[in-house]
């Protein structure tokens, strides 16, 4: 979910602002639901009335956010599947699934998402009143990755996890490059130390094709030798006043 929001904020104009409005409405609504647990009668009805516009804002911004996520997944999924085949050719095809209580179709519009979301709010209103927090909305949704028809989350080996992370990274770079006409600046933190030689080669090849990348490592030995030879290196040293870049 966090990955989708991060990529969508760079891929779609206005997505980040929509997400910010949604999160604000969610905080306000959850506060009111919690307050309602402490009162009853007229006071509880007053809180329900105060909560109504926040619910409407959640439906509006939430449906726009879900539609944005679905559009992103539709564009990202085939690219991700292709990059995963490059990184892990021995593994079965990778599939991406959007998981939600509302069971959205991959091509649903924002208005269709809003209809489903409004129905979910109606269905969970009583339970929310007992539990004191919002039970539906895109903040509850998730993504599942299937390899060979099975969800890899419960059983993925470290190798499978690394393959998926690299494939996601490469797919994100491809998608953003196609959208904006130029590649993003790549930031990698200690990415090489746990990669096997094959995955290192894939990562080095991708980095070499980018105009600019910033990579951190605890030791130069953790980086691919060919990459170090082409890079401008800086060492961070601990001094009396904290860490600093060595001259």
Task: List the predicted regions and their residue ranges.
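Secondary-structure edge/capping motif, primarily at the C-terminal ends of alpha-helices
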Residues: 33-40
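A structural signal for well-ordered alpha-helices, especially hydrophobic packing surfaces
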Residues: 29, 33, 62-65
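Walker B catalytic acidic pair
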Residues: 189-191
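Hydrophobic/aromatic beta-strand patches that form the interior of the parallel beta-sheet core
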Residues: 214, 232-234
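Hydrophobic positions in the central parallel beta-sheet of the AAA+
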Residues: 184-187, 215
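Extended, charged alpha-helical "arm/stalk" segments used for dimerization and assembly
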Residues: 1-32
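Conserved NTPase motor "head" modules and their coupling/switch loops across ABC/AAA+ ATPases, GTPases
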Residues: 42-185, 194-198, 202-210, 221-230, ...
């Amino acid at each position: 979910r966090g990955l989708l929001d991060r990529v969508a904020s760079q891929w779609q104009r206005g997505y980040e602002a929509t997400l910010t409005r949604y999160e604000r409405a969610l905080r306000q609504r959850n506060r009111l639901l919690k307050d309602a647990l402490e009162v009853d009668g007229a006071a509880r009805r007053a809180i329900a009335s105060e909560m109504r516009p926040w619910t409407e804002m959640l439906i509006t911004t939430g449906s726009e956010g879900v539609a944005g996520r679905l559009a992103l997944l539709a564009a990202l999924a085939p690219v991700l599947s292709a990059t995963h085949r490059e990184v892990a050719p021995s593994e079965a095809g990778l599939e991406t699934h959007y998981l939600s209580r509302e069971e959205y179709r991959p091509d649903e519009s924002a208005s269709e998402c809003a209809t489903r979301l409004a129905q979910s709010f109606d269905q969970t209103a009583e339970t929310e009143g007992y539990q004191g927090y919002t039970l539906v909305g895109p903040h509850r949704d998730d993504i599942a990755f299937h390899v060979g028809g099975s969800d890899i989350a419960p059983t993925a080996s470290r190798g499978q996890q690394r393959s998926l992370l690299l494939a996601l990274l490469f797919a994100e770079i491809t998608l953003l490059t196609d959208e904006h006409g130029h590649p993003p600046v790549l930031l990698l933190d200690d990415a090489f130390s746990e990669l096997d030689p094959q995955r290192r080669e894939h990562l080095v090849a991708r980095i070499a094709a980018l105009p600019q990348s910033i990579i951190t490592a605890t030791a130069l030995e953790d980086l691919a030798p060919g990459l170090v030879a082409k890079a401008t290196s800086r060492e961070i040293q601990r001094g009396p006043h904290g860490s600093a870049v060595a001259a």
